[in-house]
């Protein structure tokens, strides 16, 4: 899980979702998991 100021999809499997005012990237590649904060 990376915590970043700007979250961007890295590959075509990355999905941006908003969960309780937190922007997240979920992906089947575990390295691509990100959270804004």
Swiss-Prot record:
MF terms (GO), sorted A to Z: structural constituent of ribosome
Keyword entries, A-Z: Ribonucleoprotein, Ribosomal protein
GO cellular component terms given for this protein: cytoplasm; ribonucleoprotein complex; ribosome
PROSITE patterns cross-referenced by the UniProt entry: RIBOSOMAL_L36 (PS00828)
One GO-annotated biological process of the protein: translation
InterPro entries: Ribosomal_bL36, Ribosomal_bL36_sp
Organism superkingdom: Bacteria
Family: Belongs to the bacterial ribosomal protein bL36 family.
Name of the featured protein: Large ribosomal subunit protein bL36
Originating species: Mycoplasma pneumoniae (strain ATCC 29342 / M129 / Subtype 1)
Gene: rpmJ
């Amino acid at each position: 899980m990376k915590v970043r100021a700007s979250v961007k999809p890295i590959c075509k499997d990355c999905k941006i979702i908003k969960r309780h005012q937190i922007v997240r990237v979920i992906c089947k590649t575990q390295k691509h998991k990100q959270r804004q904060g």
